[in-house]
């Protein structure tokens, strides 16, 4: 049922905490509604843990959308991600897996303002995504706080879908950053071996 012929897969990672899911799901559902007004050949695959599947399902069932699926099996998740034409992910280590499979993506994140303000005071980084932090620039688009809304998400995702060059450029850039990270990890392992 998931791998319907003539349908392109978009993988969606709405978070691993209930609080994140409750903030991001309404945004994601409204984004899918906007997409469905124009595009009719996408299936949205929500990657979830077994414990959060029901919560995500409740959001999907609350609206008239029939092109969403939820998966919680890790093997199926990897297979689905590999076959995806795009990924939308809450910031976190999952972005490394997305890049490893050469899937173009966007990072979204929203938290309550007090927590965000405290986090910004404690962590002085320009980006939240590990690829962007390593690159020192925005390789993967990030929609944070107020920018994390259905309209901006639709605008960026559709701009990628409509432009194969943009997709190719992002994949090339992420692969370059991944290779740099691998080299740095290998070098630090060699150094620690030499010093031990």
Regions found by a protein language model. Name each.
Residues 1-196:
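Nucleotide-activated sugar donor-binding and catalytic core shared by glycosyltransferases
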């Amino acid at each position: 049922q998931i791998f319907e012929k003539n349908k392109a897969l978009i993988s969606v990672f709405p978070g691993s905490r209930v609080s994140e899911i409750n903030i991001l799901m309404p945004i994601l559902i409204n984004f899918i509604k906007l997409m469905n007004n124009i595009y009719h050949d996408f299936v949205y695959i929500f990657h979830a843990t077994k414990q959060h599947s029901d919560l995500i399902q409740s959001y999907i069932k609350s609206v008239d959308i029939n092109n969403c699926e939820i998966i919680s099996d890790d093997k199926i998740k990897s297979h689905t991600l590999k076959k995806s034409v795009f990924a939308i992910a809450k910031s976190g280590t999952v972005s490394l897996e997305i890049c490893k499979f050469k899937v173009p993506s966007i990072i979204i994140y929203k938290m309550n303002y007090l927590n965000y303000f405290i986090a910004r005071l404690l962590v002085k980084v320009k980006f939240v995504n590990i690829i962007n932090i390593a690159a020192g620039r925005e390789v993967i688009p990030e929609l944070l706080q107020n920018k994390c809304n259905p309209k901006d998400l639709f605008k960026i995702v559709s701009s990628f879908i409509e432009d194969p060059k943009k997709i190719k450029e992002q994949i090339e850039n992420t692969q370059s950053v991944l290779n740099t990270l691998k080299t740095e990890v290998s070098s630090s392992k060699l150094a620690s071996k030499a010093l031990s």
